[in-house]
Amino acid sequence: MRYNQLSYIPTSLETAVAELQALGFAVQQEQAPKENFAIFLRKLFFHFQDTDYPLSHMIASKDLDLLTFLTSDATLTKEVFDLVALQVLGFIPAVDFTDAQDFIQKIGFPIVFDSQQLLLNLHQLLATRQKSGVTLIDSLVSQGLLPMDNCYHYFNGKALATFDTTSLIREVVYVEAPLDTDQDGQLDLIKVNIIRPKASTAIPSMMTASPYHQGINETANDKKLHRMEGELSPKAPRRITVEPTDFQPLATKPSRLPVNECQETFSHISSYTLNDYFLARGFANLYVSGVGTAGSTGFMTSGDYAQIESFKAVIDWLNGRATAYTSHKRDYQIKADWSNGLVATTGKSYLGTMSTGLATTGVDGLAVIIAEAAISSWYDYYRENGLVCSPGGYPGEDLDVLTELTYSRNLLPGDYLRHNDHYQQLLSQQSQALERQSGNYNQFWHDRNYLPQADRIKCEVVYTHGLQDWNVKPRQVYNIFNALPDSLGKHLFLHHGEHVYMHNWQSIDFREAMNALLCQKMLGQNNGFTLPTIIWQDNQKEQTWKELTAFGGHSKRQIALGDDHVLIDNHYGEEDFKRYSKDFRAFKAELFEGKANQAVIDILLEEDLPINGQACLKLKLKSSENKGILAAQLLDYGKKKRFADIPAILELDSIDNGQQFAREALKELPFKDSPYRVVTKGVLNLQHRSDLLTIEDIPNDQWMTITFHLQPTIYHMAKGDTLRVVLYTTDFEHTIRDNSNYALTLDLEQSYLLIPTDEEE
């Protein structure tokens, strides 16, 4: 384990003492440090009447137990404090370490002992994570240090788990959205599942906008998958034009219906454990699936501002600006009189995507978004540079396939009976509008691009994204983060995992940092917390995170690619083509081993290469036909230790998100030997070699010069490492599987690689 403590808020001695005393630690500024130390330690064992017993099982040095030390005349030193602090945090001498001082350095222990400031040291110790992944104070509260009295209690600017999760209110309401997406003449109703504690004051809300949450239709999804095999068709040259998105909600008016209490409850809904963490700390949890999902009405419009409006309506209801009904009969309205109107949105992938879309509406009441692996432009999810480009791991998926997956109204037989025929008509229109045949950007995709509305965002923004996420690729967060107004509080966590959550990792106190931020923004805590702009996981060191100021450098390093001509054949023999089409992973493995149709350029680095941003290939090439796909990958090549892209479980049920509530596993990305690592990649339709909106002819056997930007990343390579450039045509995971007989020729002498290298240390 290594500490990267973001969440601790430095405080005054007076505040530290007051907070310690409020928790029952009877320390006093006037008392000697060793006496305060003993009082603090004995309070940790509040389950014991005889606290001598647990103290006797700890040590103060290699030859002295802690109880004996505390009752002796020996002085409290840094060595004693550090050794005891490690044990309090769950580290075991002779098991986790032998030399405490060496171990303190190795793990980056965040507390610097000062006998004159011991109470501040103890205050920080309570706010420091144990080996198990929870802070010492959270561990104590989970054991019953404080009662679950449904009132807010804070420590170091963060809410504690004092809300009773054994007696929660679970209710369902139906919010009226200013939409009629299924064209039935009635405003769409949006089902909202609410879980909230029995608080006596108005409370904020965590809202997860999840089109998956009311169920998914995998059968319909699988039937709708598109065939990847086909021929890349040349497109007529033209300039693509689009109009600004102009979504207009329908008119609504305040309801005059009588107000009633909730008429529908539920016992269970699958939850997100970060929400559970905040539920125990006095935040309501809302799960909303939006239009076209089971329990709601409307059509699944998949990514546009109508879908986003269905989630926005819920925030409007929480603030008294929209109507919610107790049932589909629409005969009683229900008020959110328990809400303080402030909302934070959470969730990964589609869920985080809806957070971004919501933020671009500028809706009042949305205080913070915590968007993980979020899409900012749906075109860039299903397309790339004029090509159909399936998300990593899901060849054949497209937006209409996602619609089939998430249109969960068809999982209700009555809804299927009444509405499926009309749904199929609307789905057919959607399938036509997404222009799969051409791969072009068009108005349909522009209406699902949130980047032009980024200047409307006014809430605090937190993004997390994996630099090995080839599902929702890094360009999605790179573009939205760099489009955000400078006036915003904006924060980005970049890790080296794939499409994964990171709130339960051992090496970074993400949960606690979000606690401090949300208490500041949603509970009025003037805690002085400041979250860095960018927190990046160092790819060269295990469990090490660094603070940066920018994603994307302005300095460029030019790297030559060679001095000869290379030919890349697109066509494969029938057996190989069938094998690769059946298993794209076999294609990837052979591509990385240099066994596919490709050009491979190995570059031995003569100096460190700190990549930050979009690597760019400047290439001179020609195609034997009037079409062509160019794909590229950059690899960190050669055996060495690197991060795996999926977090491993360190300890099951290690993290208690409340008081014996919603336990989850502690995880971390393994750091282990591997033969190579994908640094970045991309695909390009050569007819879009100038820009996305310009379609150009490809003249047969005539040289062209292209600029090809790959996916952005932050990745550091060292002197002596090998950077492998892989250039090829068809990508069996992502692009159309075109086996036609054409070839690309590259003039490497007239080509080069540009690497952005601005970095902060």
UniProtKB/Swiss-Prot annotation:
Provide the active-site residues from the annotation. S349 (charge relay system), D469 (charge relay system), H499 (charge relay system)
A GO CC annotation recorded here is: cytoplasm
**EC number(s) stated in the UniProt entry for this protein:** 3.4.14.11
Q: Does the keyword Cytoplasm apply?
A: yes
Q: Which SMART domains match?
A: PepX_C, PepX_N
**One record GO biological process:** proteolysis
* GO molecular function terms listed in the Swiss-Prot or TrEMBL record: aminopeptidase activity; dipeptidyl-peptidase activity; serine-type peptidase activity
Principal subcellular localization: cytoplasm
**Which UniProt keywords are listed?**
Aminopeptidase, Cytoplasm, Hydrolase, Protease, Serine protease
Looking up Pfam families in the UniProt record yields: Peptidase_S15, PepX_C, PepX_N
List locations, semicolon-separated.
Cytoplasm
Under InterPro entries, the record lists: AB_hydrolase_fold, Galactose-bd-like_sf, Pept_S15_Xpro, PepX_N_dom, PepX_N_dom_sf, Xaa-Pro-like_dom, Xaa-Pro_dipept_C, Xaa-Pro_dipeptidyl-ppase/CocE
Q: Which reaction does it catalyse?
A: Hydrolyzes Xaa-Pro-|- bonds to release unblocked, N-terminal dipeptides from substrates including Ala-Pro-|-p-nitroanilide and (sequentially) Tyr-Pro-|-Phe-Pro-|-Gly-Pro-|-Ile
Q: Which domain of life is it from?
A: Bacteria
Task: Indicate the family of this protein.
Answer: Belongs to the peptidase S15 family.
Quaternary assembly = Homodimer.
Q: What NCBIfam families does the database record attribute to this sequence?
A: PRK05371.1-4
HAMAP family associated with the record: Aminopeptidase_S15 (MF_00698)
The job of this chain, per UniProt, is described as: Removes N-terminal dipeptides sequentially from polypeptides having unsubstituted N-termini provided that the penultimate residue is proline.
Name used for this protein in its record: Xaa-Pro dipeptidyl-peptidase
